[in-house]
């Protein structure tokens, strides 16, 4: 990638045929806004200077793209201030792309730039061939294959509409020539973006096309039916990417893997698994069925069965589930077992600890090789504030124990089943906090005789 390159994303169209409270550019593709896919592709292409042009009525795109470090301009603002805008980028090349085409390929963009520079073009369009060209601008060539023009669908003649080579909506421009064309467009009150190519050709600028083999680069979310198609396409693309990298996905039913997910070799993904956000999974794991992981890190040789995990870390060799829930800010150490109906929140659980069933561990720091009996609850909330529970190495927590924070159970200490522990239990001690059992002999006989 050349050092002096910038990109402009066009996200200005308002589509009344799409029933939504959000812009089409902000509709999700695998839980990520479409314009976010475009920004990611540009970053992978090596472009950091990215501006997004939005409609004058937009209220949803601007906050999102600015959060991603992109500049944002209203359409009327960019038309009125286009000259000043371009002068900021008057060296090098500028890439103009559509904001509703999520499958633009960074490799294609880089190769198109190389051809643009090597051929000395003032403008280079990225084109491809589609089976049904309706709705796309046609690439018109001469008898010897030379590029003559790019014609919009609404302006195309009958013979031009039969052409199957179409524009992807992505153009590399020489910045100085684009600046000159914009000056003319503004002077004649034309649409600066749509007419820039025609103005450059009128100036005698050199016009070229880079042909992309995959027609996916032109796919757009023009309506909800098309969005459904794009989602399925994106889902299959991600699944294939991981299969080719050595991940085992024997059945793809219900599997959804987002674009920022990393999965190690030899890991198996079972049906109903959803991997969302920035997820990193190690080697040799078994994930699923019916498991959701979001913005989390999972180590090697981990089993996650019927489990949900959010913004947490699960280290090597853990066996988790079924029906476990790992809530944000939790760290589950090596070889930890979390069984059925176990919930962990904002807690650290160290190596070899077993929490087998029906237990809540919240706001807690748990040591190594601790055993939790069934029905243990860390009572962390007073109604006004939350406190932490500390359980040291090799402790044994009896069934149906309530640990009322702030409280510490010492190393090697035990709590008796059914206890409500409100005071610290010293190391190697037994904490008993329950009423003494009383047996009333013959009570049933007397009751029946009443």
What are these regions (language model features)?
Residues 167-170, 259, 387, 405:
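Glycine/small-residue-rich pyrophosphate-binding loop that anchors the diphosphate of NDP-sugar donors
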Residues 147-240:
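Catalytic-core segments of class I nucleotidyltransferases/pyrophosphorylases
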Residues 2-62, 70-73, 109-115:
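N-terminal glycine-rich phosphate-binding loop and ensuing alpha1 helix
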Residues 201-308, 314-317:
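Extended, small-residue-rich solenoid/repeat segments and analogous flexible loops
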Residues 5-6, 20, 25, 39-41, ...:
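Catalytic cores of nucleotide-enabled group-transfer and carboxylate-activating enzymes in metabolic
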């Amino acid at each position: 990638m050349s050092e002096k390159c910038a990109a402009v994303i066009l996200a200005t169209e308002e589509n009344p045929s799409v029933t939504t409270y959000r812009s089409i550019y902000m509709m999700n593709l695998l839980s990520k806004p479409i314009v976010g896919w475009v920004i990611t592709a540009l970053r992978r292409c090596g472009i950091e200077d990215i501006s997004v042009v939005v409609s004058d009525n937009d209220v949803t795109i601007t906050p999102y793209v600015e959060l991603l470090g992109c500049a944002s301009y209203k359409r009327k603002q960019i038309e009125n201030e286009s000259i000043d805008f371009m002068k900021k980028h008057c060296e090098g090349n500028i890439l103009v792309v559509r904001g509703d085409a999520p499958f633009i390929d960074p490799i294609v963009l880089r190769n198109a730039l190389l051809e643009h520079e090597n051929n000395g073009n003032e403008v280079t369009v990225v084109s491809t061939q589609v089976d049904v060209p309706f709705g796309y601008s046609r690439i018109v060539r001469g008898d010897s294959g030379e590029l003559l023009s790019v014609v919009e669908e609404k302006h195309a003649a009958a013979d031009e509409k039969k052409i199957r080579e179409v524009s992807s909506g992505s153009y590399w421009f020489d910045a100085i020539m684009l600046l000159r064309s914009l000056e003319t467009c503004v002077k004649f009150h034309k649409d600066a973006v749509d007419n820039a190519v025609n103005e450059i050709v009128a100036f005698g600028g050199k016009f070229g096309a880079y042909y992309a083999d995959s027609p996916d680069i032109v796919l757009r979310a023009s309506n909800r039916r098309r969005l459904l198609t794009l989602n399925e396409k994106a889902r299959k693309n991600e699944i294939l990417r991981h299969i080719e990298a050595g991940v085992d996905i024997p059945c793809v039913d219900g599997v959804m893997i987002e674009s920022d997910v990393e999965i190690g070799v030899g890991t198996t993904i079972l049906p109903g698994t959803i991997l969302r956000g920035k997820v990193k999974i190690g080697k040799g794991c078994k994930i699923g069925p019916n498991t959701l992981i979001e913005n989390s890190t999972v180590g090697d040789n981990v089993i996650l069965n019927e489990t949900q995990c959010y913004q947490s870390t699960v280290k090597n060799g853990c066996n988790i589930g079924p029906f476990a829930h790992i809530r944000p800010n939790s760290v589950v150490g090596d070889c930890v077992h979390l069984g059925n109906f176990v919930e962990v929140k904002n807690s650290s659980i160290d190596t070899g600890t077993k929490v087998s069933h029906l237990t809540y561990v919240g706001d807690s720091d748990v040591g190594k090789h601790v055993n939790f009996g069934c029905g243990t609850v860390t009572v962390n909330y007073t109604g006004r504030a939350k406190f932490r529970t500390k359980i040291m190495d090799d402790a044994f927590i009896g069934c149906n124990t309530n640990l009322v924070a702030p409280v510490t159970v010492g190393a090697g200490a035990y709590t008796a089943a059914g206890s409500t522990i409100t005071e610290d239990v010293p190391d190697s001690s037994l904490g008993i906090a329950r009423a003494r059992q009383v047996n009333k002999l013959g009570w049933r006989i007397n009751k029946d005789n009443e």
